[in-house]
Protein backbone atom coordinates (compact mmCIF):
# COMPACT_ATOMS: atom_id res chain seq x y z
CA UNK A 1 0.00 0.00 0.00
CA UNK A 2 1.34 3.44 -0.90
CA UNK A 3 2.20 5.97 1.76
CA UNK A 4 -0.52 8.49 2.54
CA UNK A 5 2.03 10.92 3.98
CA UNK A 6 4.03 12.83 1.33
CA UNK A 7 7.14 14.67 2.40
CA UNK A 8 7.78 17.41 -0.15
CA UNK A 9 7.30 18.85 -3.61
CA UNK A 10 10.48 18.86 -5.67
CA UNK A 11 11.27 22.23 -7.28
CA UNK A 12 13.44 23.19 -10.26
CA UNK A 13 14.06 26.45 -12.10
CA UNK A 14 12.84 26.53 -15.70
CA UNK A 15 16.52 26.69 -16.72
CA UNK A 16 17.21 23.22 -15.29
CA UNK A 17 17.83 20.38 -17.76
CA UNK A 18 14.58 18.85 -18.95
CA UNK A 19 15.88 15.38 -18.04
CA UNK A 20 16.21 16.40 -14.37
CA UNK A 21 12.70 17.83 -14.25
CA UNK A 22 11.32 14.76 -16.00
CA UNK A 23 13.08 12.42 -13.55
CA UNK A 24 11.38 14.19 -10.62
CA UNK A 25 8.05 14.00 -12.46
CA UNK A 26 8.51 10.26 -12.97
CA UNK A 27 9.35 9.76 -9.30
CA UNK A 28 6.62 11.82 -7.64
CA UNK A 29 4.10 12.38 -10.42
CA UNK A 30 4.37 16.13 -9.85
CA UNK A 31 7.09 18.76 -9.80
CA UNK A 32 7.17 22.55 -9.45
CA UNK A 33 8.91 24.48 -12.24
CA UNK A 34 9.82 27.99 -11.13
CA UNK A 35 9.63 30.68 -13.81
CA UNK A 36 7.90 28.39 -16.31
CA UNK A 37 6.13 31.43 -17.81
CA UNK A 38 8.05 34.75 -17.66
CA UNK A 39 6.30 37.08 -15.18
CA UNK A 40 5.86 39.85 -17.77
CA UNK A 41 4.05 37.43 -20.11
CA UNK A 42 1.82 36.27 -17.30
CA UNK A 43 0.97 39.84 -16.28
CA UNK A 44 0.01 40.79 -19.86
CA UNK A 45 -2.02 37.61 -20.25
CA UNK A 46 -3.91 38.32 -17.04
CA UNK A 47 -4.74 41.84 -18.21
CA UNK A 48 -5.99 40.57 -21.59
CA UNK A 49 -8.42 38.07 -20.06
CA UNK A 50 -9.60 40.35 -17.24
CA UNK A 51 -12.67 41.73 -19.08
CA UNK A 52 -13.87 38.20 -19.83
CA UNK A 53 -13.29 37.08 -16.25
CA UNK A 54 -15.31 40.00 -14.91
CA UNK A 55 -18.33 38.88 -16.95
CA UNK A 56 -18.43 35.42 -15.34
CA UNK A 57 -20.95 35.16 -12.53
CA UNK A 58 -19.78 33.48 -9.33
CA UNK A 59 -21.88 30.47 -8.31
CA UNK A 60 -22.47 29.79 -4.62
CA UNK A 61 -23.85 26.27 -4.30
CA UNK A 62 -22.55 24.88 -0.99
CA UNK A 63 -23.10 21.38 -2.38
CA UNK A 64 -19.55 20.18 -2.98
CA UNK A 65 -19.69 21.09 -6.68
CA UNK A 66 -16.25 21.91 -8.11
CA UNK A 67 -17.64 25.18 -9.50
CA UNK A 68 -18.73 26.47 -6.07
CA UNK A 69 -17.21 29.97 -5.94
CA UNK A 70 -14.82 29.12 -8.79
CA UNK A 71 -14.65 30.91 -12.15
CA UNK A 72 -13.55 28.95 -15.23
CA UNK A 73 -12.75 30.33 -18.70
CA UNK A 74 -11.47 28.35 -21.70
CA UNK A 75 -11.60 30.77 -24.66
CA UNK A 76 -7.99 31.78 -24.06
CA UNK A 77 -6.58 31.37 -27.55
CA UNK A 78 -9.22 33.68 -29.07
CA UNK A 79 -9.01 36.22 -26.24
CA UNK A 80 -5.32 36.72 -25.49
CA UNK A 81 -2.64 37.52 -28.12
CA UNK A 82 0.01 36.94 -25.45
CA UNK A 83 -1.35 33.46 -24.85
CA UNK A 84 -1.43 32.36 -28.49
CA UNK A 85 1.82 34.01 -29.63
CA UNK A 86 4.06 33.73 -26.55
CA UNK A 87 2.86 31.50 -23.72
CA UNK A 88 1.95 28.62 -26.05
CA UNK A 89 5.44 28.70 -27.58
CA UNK A 90 7.00 27.21 -24.46
CA UNK A 91 9.85 24.96 -25.57
CA UNK A 92 10.30 23.41 -22.12
CA UNK A 93 6.68 22.25 -22.10
CA UNK A 94 7.23 20.41 -25.38
CA UNK A 95 10.58 18.95 -24.28
CA UNK A 96 8.85 17.44 -21.26
CA UNK A 97 5.76 16.26 -23.15
CA UNK A 98 7.94 14.57 -25.77
CA UNK A 99 9.53 12.56 -22.99
CA UNK A 100 6.14 11.56 -21.60
CA UNK A 101 4.13 10.81 -24.74
CA UNK A 102 6.23 10.58 -27.91
CA UNK A 103 8.25 7.89 -29.64
CA UNK A 104 11.29 8.69 -31.81
CA UNK A 105 10.38 9.48 -35.41
CA UNK A 106 6.64 9.76 -34.78
CA UNK A 107 6.20 13.47 -34.18
CA UNK A 108 4.00 14.76 -31.38
CA UNK A 109 2.25 12.04 -29.40
CA UNK A 110 0.01 14.51 -27.58
CA UNK A 111 -2.41 17.41 -27.97
CA UNK A 112 -4.33 19.83 -25.79
CA UNK A 113 -7.24 18.48 -23.80
CA UNK A 114 -8.19 21.90 -22.43
CA UNK A 115 -6.63 25.28 -21.73
CA UNK A 116 -8.36 27.10 -18.93
CA UNK A 117 -8.15 29.87 -16.39
CA UNK A 118 -9.41 28.77 -12.99
CA UNK A 119 -10.02 31.46 -10.39
CA UNK A 120 -10.82 30.37 -6.83
CA UNK A 121 -12.88 33.04 -5.10
CA UNK A 122 -12.75 34.08 -1.42
CA UNK A 123 -14.63 31.59 0.70
CA UNK A 124 -14.45 28.78 -1.86
CA UNK A 125 -14.40 25.37 -0.14
CA UNK A 126 -11.62 22.88 -0.67
CA UNK A 127 -12.10 20.76 -3.77
CA UNK A 128 -12.57 17.03 -3.32
CA UNK A 129 -9.40 15.03 -3.81
CA UNK A 130 -9.27 13.35 -7.20
CA UNK A 131 -7.08 12.19 -10.07
CA UNK A 132 -7.41 13.99 -13.41
CA UNK A 133 -7.32 10.71 -15.33
CA UNK A 134 -10.77 9.98 -13.90
CA UNK A 135 -11.88 11.74 -17.10
CA UNK A 136 -11.07 8.38 -18.75
CA UNK A 137 -12.50 6.00 -16.11
CA UNK A 138 -10.80 2.82 -17.32
CA UNK A 139 -7.30 4.30 -16.90
CA UNK A 140 -7.24 3.86 -13.11
CA UNK A 141 -7.87 0.13 -13.57
CA UNK A 142 -4.58 -0.26 -15.49
CA UNK A 143 -2.57 0.63 -12.39
CA UNK A 144 0.52 2.73 -11.75
CA UNK A 145 2.63 1.22 -14.56
CA UNK A 146 0.20 2.19 -17.32
CA UNK A 147 1.34 4.86 -19.80
CA UNK A 148 0.37 8.40 -18.92
CA UNK A 149 -2.94 9.45 -20.42
CA UNK A 150 -2.92 13.06 -19.19
CA UNK A 151 -0.40 15.64 -18.00
CA UNK A 152 -1.36 19.02 -16.58
CA UNK A 153 0.76 22.17 -16.40
CA UNK A 154 -0.91 24.32 -13.73
CA UNK A 155 0.55 27.84 -13.67
CA UNK A 156 0.15 30.52 -11.02
CA UNK A 157 -1.23 33.76 -12.49
CA UNK A 158 -1.46 35.25 -8.99
CA UNK A 159 0.46 34.03 -5.93
CA UNK A 160 -0.55 30.61 -4.58
CA UNK A 161 -0.65 30.54 -0.77
CA UNK A 162 -2.04 28.18 1.81
CA UNK A 163 -4.53 30.86 2.79
CA UNK A 164 -5.95 31.49 -0.70
CA UNK A 165 -6.40 27.87 -1.73
CA UNK A 166 -3.14 26.69 -3.27
CA UNK A 167 -3.60 23.28 -4.87
CA UNK A 168 -2.83 20.44 -2.49
CA UNK A 169 -0.89 17.56 -4.05
CA UNK A 170 -0.01 14.04 -2.90
CA UNK A 171 3.47 13.32 -4.32
CA UNK A 172 4.02 9.65 -5.03
CA UNK A 173 0.31 8.81 -5.31
CA UNK A 174 1.03 8.04 -8.97
CA UNK A 175 2.87 4.93 -7.75
CA UNK A 176 0.27 3.56 -5.33
CA UNK A 177 -0.44 -0.11 -6.18
CA UNK A 178 -4.12 0.64 -6.74
CA UNK A 179 -5.30 3.83 -8.43
CA UNK A 180 -8.85 4.28 -7.22
CA UNK A 181 -11.51 6.92 -6.87
CA UNK A 182 -10.90 8.88 -3.67
CA UNK A 183 -13.87 7.90 -1.56
CA UNK A 184 -14.65 5.75 1.46
CA UNK A 185 -15.74 2.79 -0.67
CA UNK A 186 -12.85 2.48 -3.13
CA UNK A 187 -9.78 4.02 -1.45
CA UNK A 188 -8.11 2.19 1.48
CA UNK A 189 -6.30 5.41 2.46
CA UNK A 190 -9.45 7.53 2.48
CA UNK A 191 -9.51 9.89 5.44
CA UNK A 192 -5.78 9.40 6.06
CA UNK A 193 -4.35 11.16 3.01
CA UNK A 194 -2.01 14.05 3.76
CA UNK A 195 -1.23 16.56 1.03
CA UNK A 196 1.33 19.27 0.32
CA UNK A 197 0.34 22.79 -0.83
CA UNK A 198 1.86 24.02 -4.10
CA UNK A 199 3.15 27.41 -2.95
CA UNK A 200 4.02 29.38 -6.09
CA UNK A 201 4.67 32.86 -7.44
CA UNK A 202 3.21 34.18 -10.72
CA UNK A 203 4.81 32.32 -13.62
CA UNK A 204 5.65 29.22 -11.59
CA UNK A 205 3.81 26.01 -12.41
CA UNK A 206 3.47 22.45 -11.31
CA UNK A 207 3.63 19.66 -13.87
CA UNK A 208 1.35 16.84 -12.76
CA UNK A 209 0.52 13.32 -13.90
CA UNK A 210 -3.12 12.39 -14.33
CA UNK A 211 -2.43 9.67 -11.73
CA UNK A 212 -1.66 12.10 -8.90
CA UNK A 213 -4.18 12.83 -6.16
CA UNK A 214 -4.82 16.54 -5.72
CA UNK A 215 -7.45 19.21 -5.12
CA UNK A 216 -7.73 22.97 -4.75
CA UNK A 217 -7.43 24.17 -1.18
CA UNK A 218 -9.96 26.23 0.75
CA UNK A 219 -9.69 29.97 0.03
CA UNK A 220 -9.93 31.31 3.56
CA UNK A 221 -9.22 34.92 2.60
CA UNK A 222 -11.76 37.73 2.42
CA UNK A 223 -10.60 39.27 -0.86
CA UNK A 224 -7.85 37.19 -2.53
CA UNK A 225 -8.84 35.70 -5.91
CA UNK A 226 -6.43 32.86 -6.64
CA UNK A 227 -6.05 32.74 -10.43
CA UNK A 228 -4.40 29.89 -12.34
CA UNK A 229 -3.70 28.98 -15.96
CA UNK A 230 -3.98 25.26 -16.72
CA UNK A 231 -2.73 23.42 -19.81
CA UNK A 232 -4.25 19.94 -19.84
CA UNK A 233 -2.57 17.67 -22.39
CA UNK A 234 -3.48 14.11 -23.40
CA UNK A 235 -2.07 11.38 -25.59
CA UNK A 236 -3.15 11.72 -29.20
CA UNK A 237 -5.28 8.57 -29.11
CA UNK A 238 -7.76 10.18 -26.69
CA UNK A 239 -10.61 12.61 -27.34
CA UNK A 240 -10.16 16.05 -25.73
CA UNK A 241 -12.66 17.89 -23.55
CA UNK A 242 -12.57 20.94 -25.84
CA UNK A 243 -13.59 20.68 -29.53
CA UNK A 244 -10.98 23.30 -30.39
CA UNK A 245 -11.10 23.11 -34.23
CA UNK A 246 -14.86 23.66 -34.18
CA UNK A 247 -14.78 26.96 -32.29
CA UNK A 248 -11.36 28.48 -32.96
CA UNK A 249 -11.77 30.64 -36.11
CA UNK A 250 -9.44 29.84 -39.01
CA UNK A 251 -8.25 33.44 -38.89
CA UNK A 252 -6.83 32.72 -35.43
CA UNK A 253 -5.57 29.25 -36.41
CA UNK A 254 -3.50 30.65 -39.28
CA UNK A 255 -1.70 32.95 -36.81
CA UNK A 256 -0.49 29.99 -34.74
CA UNK A 257 2.79 28.19 -35.29
CA UNK A 258 2.52 24.75 -36.95
CA UNK A 259 3.38 23.12 -33.62
CA UNK A 260 0.59 24.95 -31.83
CA UNK A 261 -1.83 24.29 -34.70
CA UNK A 262 -1.22 20.59 -34.13
CA UNK A 263 -1.83 20.97 -30.39
CA UNK A 264 -5.29 22.40 -31.14
CA UNK A 265 -6.22 19.80 -33.79
CA UNK A 266 -5.54 21.78 -36.96
CA UNK A 267 -2.84 19.31 -38.04
CA UNK A 268 -2.55 15.53 -37.98
CA UNK A 269 -0.07 13.40 -36.09
CA UNK A 270 1.50 10.24 -37.45
CA UNK A 271 2.20 6.79 -36.09
CA UNK A 272 4.18 4.02 -37.76
CA UNK A 273 2.36 0.67 -37.63
CA UNK A 274 4.58 -2.12 -39.02
CA UNK A 275 5.06 -0.98 -42.65
CA UNK A 276 2.25 1.58 -42.70
CA UNK A 277 2.01 5.17 -41.49
CA UNK A 278 -1.27 6.19 -39.88
CA UNK A 279 -2.46 9.79 -39.67
CA UNK A 280 -4.42 10.48 -36.51
CA UNK A 281 -7.11 13.12 -37.12
CA UNK A 282 -6.36 13.05 -40.83
CA UNK A 283 -8.11 13.55 -44.17
CA UNK A 284 -8.11 10.60 -46.58
CA UNK A 285 -4.68 9.50 -45.38
CA UNK A 286 -3.21 12.99 -45.46
CA UNK A 287 -2.49 15.76 -42.97
CA UNK A 288 -5.69 17.64 -42.16
CA UNK A 289 -3.63 20.84 -42.32
CA UNK A 290 -3.32 20.42 -46.10
CA UNK A 291 -7.10 20.23 -46.44
CA UNK A 292 -7.44 23.40 -44.35
CA UNK A 293 -4.95 25.25 -46.55
CA UNK A 294 -2.41 25.78 -43.80
CA UNK A 295 1.18 26.40 -44.79
CA UNK A 296 3.31 23.26 -44.65
CA UNK A 297 5.16 22.68 -41.39
CA UNK A 298 8.07 21.05 -43.23
Curated annotation (Swiss-Prot):
Pathway: Secondary metabolite biosynthesis; terpenoid biosynthesis. Pfam families: PhyH. SUPFAM superfamilies: Clavaminate synthase-like. It catalyses: preaustinoid A1 + 2-oxoglutarate + O2 = preaustinoid A2 + succinate + CO2 + H2O; preaustinoid A2 + 2-oxoglutarate + O2 = preaustinoid A3 + succinate + CO2 + H2O; berkeleyone A + 2-oxoglutarate + O2 = preaustinoid A + succinate + CO2 + H2O. GO terms for molecular function: dioxygenase activity; metal ion binding. Disruption phenotype: Impairs the synthesis of austinol and dehydroaustinol. Keywords: Dioxygenase, Iron, Metal-binding, Oxidoreductase. The record marks 150, 232 as: Important for reaction specificity. Substrate binds at residues 72, 127, 167, 226. It comes from the Eukaryota. The keyword Iron applies. InterPro entries: Phytyl_CoA_dOase-like. Changing residue 232 to A: Gains a prhA-type 'B-ring expansion' activity to produce berkeleydione, while retaining the 'spiro-lactone forming' activity to produce preaustinoid A3. Fe cation binds at residues 130, 132, 214. Gene3D superfamilies: q2cbj1_9rhob like domain. In A.calidoustus, the austinoid gene cluster lies on a contiguous DNA region, while clusters from E.nidulans and P.brasilianum are split in their respective genomes. Genetic rearrangements provoked variability among the clusters and E.nidulans produces the least number of austionoid derivatives with the end products austinol and dehydroaustinol, while P.brasilianum can produce until acetoxydehydroaustin, and A.calidoustus produces the highest number of identified derivatives. Homodimer. Multifunctional dioxygenase; part of the gene cluster B that mediates the biosynthesis of austinol and dehydroaustinol, two fungal meroterpenoids. The first step of the pathway is the synthesis of 3,5-dimethylorsellinic acid by the polyketide synthase ausA. 3,5-dimethylorsellinic acid is then prenylated by the polyprenyl transferase ausN. Further epoxidation by the FAD-dependent monooxygenase ausM and cyclization by the probable terpene cyclase ausL lead to the formation of protoaustinoid A. Residues at positions 150 and 232 are important for the type of reaction catalyzed, using identical substrate. Both ausE and prhA accept preaustinoid A1 as a substrate to form divergent products through dynamic skeletal rearrangement. AusE (containing 'Leu-150' and 'Ser-232') first desaturates at C1-C2 to form preaustinoid A2, followed by rearrangement leading to the formation of the spiro-lactone in preaustinoid A3. This is Multifunctional dioxygenase ausE. It comes from Emericella nidulans (strain FGSC A4 / ATCC 38163 / CBS 112.46 / NRRL 194 / M139) (Aspergillus nidulans). The lineage of its organism: Eukaryota, Fungi, Dikarya, Ascomycota, Pezizomycotina.
Amino acid sequence: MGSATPSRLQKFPATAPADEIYAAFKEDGCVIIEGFVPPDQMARFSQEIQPAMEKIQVQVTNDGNSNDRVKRFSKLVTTSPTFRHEILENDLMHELLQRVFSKPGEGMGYHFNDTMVIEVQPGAPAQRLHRDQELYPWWNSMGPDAPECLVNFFCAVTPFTVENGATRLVPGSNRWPELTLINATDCPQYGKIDSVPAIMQPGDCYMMSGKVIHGAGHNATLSDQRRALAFSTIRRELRPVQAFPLWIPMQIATELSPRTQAMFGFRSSTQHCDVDTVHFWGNDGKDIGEHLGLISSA
